[in-house]
Design a protein with these regions (language model features):
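Second-shell loop/turn segments in exported
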Residues: 23-31, 47-58, 113-117, 128, ...
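Noncatalytic luminal/extracellular "stalk/propeptide" segments of secretory-pathway proteins
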Residues: 24, 50-166, 275-279, 284-286, ...
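Protein/peptide-recognition domains central to ubiquitin and immune signaling
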Residues: 39-111, 184, 197-220, 234, ...
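Metal-dependent peptidase/peptidase-like ectodomains
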Residues: 103-107, 144, 150, 226-259, ...
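A conserved hydrophobic secondary-structure block that centers on an alpha-helix together
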Residues: 130-212
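Alpha-helical metal-binding/catalytic segments enriched in His/Glu/Asp
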Residues: 179-180, 298-302, 316-375, 512
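His/Asp/Glu-rich mid-to-C-terminal helical/loop segments that flank catalytic regions of hydrolases
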Residues: 350, 483, 487-537
Length: 537
């Protein structure tokens, strides 16, 4: 859609009665051109960038290209150093040892495994901490009355009442409490030395390991890629994923079956946490080929036009890294994942910089490092923000905005996908901010995309936790994932630029441009809802 041919002043209805006129937005809106999107993405997804693997040459080229494009737009790029540890977990020498009745059993991959960026051995008695959740606003605490200091803690994955629409958490889609990082930080806060994580026994979805196995070639690729972690991350204790069999053996000390324990917690919302008498454990982690290296987040700020609001920030984000090359030498081009998002942030930086008028709040354009290695660039940013998080009002995160969603091995049997998604955009995480959703829907009256919120009602794939908006949500910043969905080329060498729907990508970015104006200009920015279950009912 082009605004220039109209001769009258066309009001853009935004989040309140206030409107932004055509004359204020037209320059930037029309600057988002398909020809530019195609040219930029053709370069980023080319063989020359070698799959943009984090800490590899192609990733460095992407960093410099993004910075150069910010400079051309008249912005001053900041290369925020992201210190990383790269390593290969040694599965032969790492183990989980369970001691009981004078006997020791050793478990290794695939029965017990985890990644940790240093050689470490920790030991202690084993305690069960339910789902490992402390949610004071919900009056729920799995650690109430449990002494976890110096202990190894066994917890269920996900969260209580996962499939109950009346759940105090969510019930039709998991909240942030269901994530392993939140569980690990909570255990660390309570003095634990390690966490054993098991898929909940009454689950109605694939475990995380089963999900990964669904993606053709995933196990082969993950096995040959090095792991990475933030050097100096706030996480300091290891997490080991254990099999159902190991968990059942440990939980036998309670006198109950694992499924009965889960059902009791879900039914009463009262912790079943307790020591597991007679059991102690040792977690030993050994790595190979460990090295320290720096990557970079590429950031640029457009200052707001209102001195009273310019200290506040709206973020447009994406990640530029992908998966490098396959064992056969072919590249994982990552055109959709996430060349599309990277190009999106760059095109919006150009659009806003070119526009004669500026929003009242400042805009931060952020392209993050090492998302594919565990959201490392965005986790580093929220621990070391360029602009304060308490005045960061909204995050528009792009990750895969260039394709039509289609059934694939990852989604088969788990979620319904429409036959025609050529004009569809998924918005993920909207329950955390109804204000955010309302602003997008108002702006979309000009653009005409079909907006879909199905991923907020899904607990098997937990997509909201899997992109760079999530670290901001953990800090109570309204942050949503703009996402055109999975397809059979996801994380395959066939994710190439010739399969991109550039017309849809342009519409998505124009919608983001209008939404950014709403967030940047309106008197009241969107609010974050800490308890999304309450907001949905």
């Amino acid at each position: 859609m082009n605004l220039r041919p109209v001769a009258f002043i066309l009001p853009v209805i935004l989040a309140s009665a206030q409107s932004v006129t055509r004359s204020r937005i037209a320059d930037g809106y029309d600057a988002i051109r398909i020809s530019d999107l195609r040219a930029d993405l053709t370069f980023l997804a080319s063989d020359a960038l070698e799959g943009r693997l984090s800490l590899a040459r192609g990733s460095d080229v992407a960093i410099e290209w993004i910075a150069a494009e910010f400079t051309k737009a008249g912005l001053k790029p900041v290369r925020q150093k992201v210190p990383l540890i790269e390593y290969h977990p040694d599965r032969e020498r790492s183990h989980l040892a369970i001691d009981s009745n004078g006997k020791r059993e050793l478990f290794r991959f695939p029965d017990a495994f985890g990644n940790f960026p240093s050689d470490i051995t920790v030991a202690g008695s084993v305690v069960f901490a339910g789902y490992g959740i402390t949610a004071p606003e919900l009056h729920y605490d799995d650690y109430a009355g449990l002494d976890a200091r110096g202990k190894i803690v066994l917890v269920f994955d996900h969260e209580p009442q996962e499939n109950d629409p009346k759940s105090i958490f969510n019930g039709t889609g998991n909240t942030r409490y269901a994530t392993s990082r939140v569980k690990l930080l909570n255990a660390q806060k309570h003095g634990a030395v390690a966490v054993l994580l098991v898929a909940e026994p009454n689950r109605k979805h694939p475990s995380n390991q089963e999900r990964l196995a669904r993606i053709a070639g995933m196990q082969q690729r993950v096995g040959r890629l090095p792991a990475q972690a933030i050097d100096g991350d706030e996480l300091r204790i290891p997490l080991i994923t254990v099999s159902d069999k190991i968990a059942a053996s440990l939980l036998a000390a309670t006198g109950k079956k694992p499924g009965d324990l889960q059902a009791g917690i879900d039914g009463t919302l009262k912790p079943a946490s307790q020591p597991l008498p007679g059991f102690s454990a040792e977690v030993k982690n050994v790595d190979r080929d460990r090295r320290l290296a720096d990557s970079a987040n590429v950031l640029a700020t457009l200052e707001g036009s209102d001195p009273a609001l310019a200290a506040e920030t709206i973020v447009f984000s994406a990640h530029y890294d992908h998966d490098g090359s396959a064992v056969n030498g072919e590249y994982y081009h990552g055109a959709d994942d996430n060349g599309s998002g990277t190009v999106g942030v760059v095109s919006l930086a150009r659009a806003y910089a070119q526009n004669r008028f500026k929003p009242r709040r400042s805009l931060l354009f952020a392209v993050f490092a090492a998302e594919e290695r565990g959201l490392l660039g965005s986790y580093y940013y929220v621990q070391h923000p360029l602009r304060p998080l308490d005045t960061t009002r909204a995050v528009i995160n792009f990750d895969m905005i260039g394709r039509n969603e289609a059934p694939s091995e990852q989604t088969k049997g788990l979620i319904e996908i429409a036959l025609d998604t050529s004009n569809e955009l998924n918005l993920v995480g909207m329950r955390y901010s109804p204000d955010y959703r309302a602003a997008v829907e108002q702006a979309n009256q000009m653009v005409g995309l079909k907006l879909n919120y199905k991923w907020d009602d899904e607990s098997a794939l937990n997509v909201y936790f899997r992109s760079d908006q999530f670290p901001f949500a953990l800090r109570n910043v309204p942050a949503m994932w703009w996402f055109t969905g999975f397809h059979p080329d996801y994380h395959q060498t066939t994710d190439t630029v010739d399969r991109i729907n550039f017309e849809k990508m342009q519409k998505i970015l124009r919608l983001a441009y209008l939404t950014g104006w709403t967030f940047g200009d309106e008197a009241a920015p969107p609010k974050f809802v800490e308890n999304p279950a309450g907001s949905a009912r």
